Amino acid sequence: MSQLKTIFKWYEAWFNSEDFNGCMFQKALEEVIKIYPSTLEPATKYKIWLTTLIQGLLTNIGIRNPSHLATLIVSILDGMTIQAHINRHSVDMDEYWMRVEHLIAFEKALP
């Protein structure tokens, strides 16, 4: 669980850094893909890498079917990134993390 929380702490530090301007992969998919379709591949590879990393961490803490929860957590991270880009001080990481812990506890309780 601590490794997964470290990812969230990394995002928090990134959001609060002076040079934070949102996610280049999100920007590539939203803004640049029509002009430069080649931006799709690195953005997709990054998303697959992050999802796979989180799936492995969830497996390590006893989640039997981690793929859906990993995808949901990546979506939460994406949403936080967009929110931080709009207003970097609006992301309360402790609140997000508490909800992720609830999701993990829910998944662990499934039969």
Show the residue positions of the predicted features.
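Structural signal for well-ordered, non-membrane alpha-helices
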Residues: 12, 51, 55, 101-104
